[in-house]
């Protein structure tokens, strides 16, 4: 009996650790602008985190803020994501893109080293299975393409799924 209880606890702990979790910092008395932004940001994060849960196993605690001075959105490896006032960026595409930065895209030495060497033994074959034998992961300016979801015109359900799958493959490669 003791072993089954320990096994159950370990299963819960490992399931919990392999997930993206997030919290949105909110004003206690939000303005109309803040309330609207909070709703859009929450919807974007809920969709992005659900997609990650369905297609990958990335793990990170995300600290999300609405910061009117931010032109679009920005993120750091420490898990902070900041969205600005431009409503065209308060969407799932932007949330997925910024989450990738919190996971290491454009943020770590491992990313820089693997990009410079084009050393993605798991991610490159995955990309090639979609885009053909000549496909490579391009890196520049702290971003990747294809499937980096760098701009709103890159959005599609297929591209969003591939983004999550590619980021998870890059994590498996040591991102």
Label the model's feature ranges.
Residues 81-96:
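Short pre-active-site segment immediately N-terminal to the catalytic Zn-binding motif
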Residues 108-175:
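Metalloprotease/metallohydrolase-associated module, dominated by Zn2+-dependent proteases
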Residues 68-70, 85-87, 107:
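Short, flexible loop/turn elements at secondary-structure junctions
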Residues 20-74:
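Auxiliary, metal-adjacent structural segments of Zn-dependent hydrolase domains
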Residues 93-106:
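Active-site recognition of the HExxH zinc-binding catalytic motif
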Residues 15-19:
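Sec/Tat signal peptide C-region and signal peptidase I cleavage site
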Residues 1-13:
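Fungal secretory targeting signals
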């Amino acid at each position: 009996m003791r072993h089954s209880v320990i096994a159950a606890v370990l299963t819960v702990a490992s399931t919990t650790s392999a997930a993206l979790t997030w919290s949105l910092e909110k004003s206690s008395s939000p303005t109309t602008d803040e309330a609207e932004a909070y709703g859009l940001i929450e919807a974007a994060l809920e969709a992005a985190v659900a997609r990650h849960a369905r297609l990958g196993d990335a793990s990170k605690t995300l600290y999300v803020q609405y910061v009117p001075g931010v032109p679009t959105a920005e993120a750091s490896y420490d898990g902070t994501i900041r969205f600005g006032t431009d409503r065209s960026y308060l969407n799932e595409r932007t949330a997925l893109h910024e989450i990738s930065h919190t996971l290491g895209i454009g943020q770590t030495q491992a990313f820089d080293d693997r990009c410079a060497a084009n050393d993605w033994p798991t991610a490159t074959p995955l990309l090639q299975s979609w885009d053909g034998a000549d496909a490579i992961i391009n890196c520049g300016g702290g971003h990747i393409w294809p499937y980096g979801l760098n701009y709103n015109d890159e959005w599609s359900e297929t591209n969003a799924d591939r983004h999550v799958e590619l980021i998870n493959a890059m994590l498996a490669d040591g991102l």
